[in-house]
Amino acid sequence: HPQTVTRLALLDIVPTRTVYTQVSKNLATWYFHWFFLIQPEPLPEMLLGGHAEPFLRNFAFRGLIPHAIAEPVFAEYLRCFANPQTVHAMCEDYRAGASIDLQHDEADLSTQLACPTLVLWGVHGAMHRLFDVLETWRPRAPAAQGKALPAGHWLPEECPQELTAALAEFLA
């Protein structure tokens, strides 16, 4: 939507198509949830139901900079994950990413982003370990700029000042 989107910031992500076309053992280990959450309903929902705390502590927030998420904030994540509709919506988002979103990506492969694009990722995260993050965006956003921040995947929680400064400069 070039008439609407004038600037784009991408946080610790590579194109979905890149993830699915460049699967490796390391990617599958770090990003197994991409393959687990796309399984047909109700399997992921059923397995996650009632198990939000171990899922969040041992997987979703693994590699997180210590104390980046305060206990009251973690409690809010738990509250949200206790709602079966939240878990179902999360699974549906990943299911769309592996189906209709990929179809749209294939149809748009030759389209390049015209707006200024900022790509930020965590130097301690899986994306940094597995990909040249900025280069994965070059075919779609040739003028993209970006850098690694001192974080894992959770940039807003792990390095809020650095993220805010980078976004403020980019959006000014």
Identify the residue ranges that each predicted region occupies.
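Flexible "cap/lid" subdomain of the alpha/beta-hydrolase fold that forms the substrate-access gate
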Residues: H1-A148, A168-F170
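Catalytic histidine-centered segment of alpha/beta-hydrolase-like enzymes
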Residues: G152-T164
